[in-house]
């Protein structure tokens, strides 16, 4: 799976007739990493959901749609319009905070050790890449702020999987929008 994402990233970047900048390369890697994490999150949630009885699955879907995640108190765009209107710096900063918050919670994902280790590793790599992108895209508006405190709330499996899936989708969306805004030649449709 990693090879496929890396290959697609290289192919997409290679299509452009212009030389690839370090910023473009970092964005391609970051988008590939978060797409992988989002796929893992969807699979974990789906596997968990499939392990339940039909009635429990219905209940899980009701609960998951109303679930409060630890990241819900982060200031972030709430819809497509607000996301597209946000600055690249804001999208990168929110993405960084979401990924950083999952470094802790990923240790509690009830999955195989290999999956948990791989997720933790990818989150760390993505966090470092996002930090480089934030630094590279500073627009003179000041440094990155880590002002809000992460609230650590105990979660059950269903909440953890649902929140992980939701947050990885957010980060994937934010990074894709930021990349498309910075590199219009990437032929993005939002």
Swiss-Prot record:
Report the GO molecular function annotations: growth hormone activity; growth hormone receptor binding
One GO term (biological process): growth hormone receptor signaling pathway
**Entry's Gene3D superfamilies?**
1.20.1250.10
- PROSITE patterns with a match to the protein in the record: SOMATOTROPIN_1, SOMATOTROPIN_2
What InterPro entries does this protein map onto?
A: 4_helix_cytokine-like_core, Somatotropin/Prolactin, Somatotropin_CS
Which interval of the chain is the signal sequence?
Answer: 1-17
This protein's record includes keyword Iron: no
Q: What intrachain disulfides are recorded?
A: 69-163, 180-188
Compartments, as annotated in UniProt: Secreted
User: Keywords assigned by UniProt?
Assistant: Disulfide bond, Hormone, Secreted, Signal
Fetch the Pfam families from UniProt: Hormone_1 (PF00103)
Q: Which GO terms describe its cellular component?
A: extracellular space
Q: What does this protein do?
A: Growth hormone plays an important role in growth control and is involved in the regulation of several anabolic processes. Implicated as an osmoregulatory substance important for seawater adaptation.
Q: Which family, according to UniProt?
A: Belongs to the somatotropin/prolactin family.
Q: What is this protein called?
A: Somatotropin
Which organism is this protein's natural source?
Answer: Paralichthys olivaceus (Bastard halibut)
């Amino acid at each position: 799976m990693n090879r496929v994402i890396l290959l697609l990233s290289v192919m997409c970047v290679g299509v452009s007739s212009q030389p690839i900048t370090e910023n473009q390369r970092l964005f391609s890697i970051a988008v590939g990493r978060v797409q992988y994490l989002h796929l893992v999150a969807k699979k974990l949630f789906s596997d968990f959901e499939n392990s339940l009885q039909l009635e429990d699955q219905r209940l899980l879907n009701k609960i998951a749609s109303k679930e409060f995640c630890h990241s819900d108190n982060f200031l972030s765009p709430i819809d497509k319009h607000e996301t597209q209107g946000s600055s690249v710096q804001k999208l990168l900063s929110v993405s960084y905070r979401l990924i950083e918050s999952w470094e802790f919670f990923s240790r509690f994902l009830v999955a195989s050790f290999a999956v948990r280790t791989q997720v933790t590793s990818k989150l760390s790599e993505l966090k470092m890449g996002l930090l480089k992108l934030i630094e590279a895209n500073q627009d003179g508006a000041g440094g990155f702020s880590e002002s809000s405190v992460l609230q650590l709330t105990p979660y059950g499996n269903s909440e953890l999987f649902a929140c992980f899936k939701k947050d990885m989708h957010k980060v994937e969306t934010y990074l894709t929008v930021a990349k498309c805004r910075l590199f219009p030649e990437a032929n993005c449709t939002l």
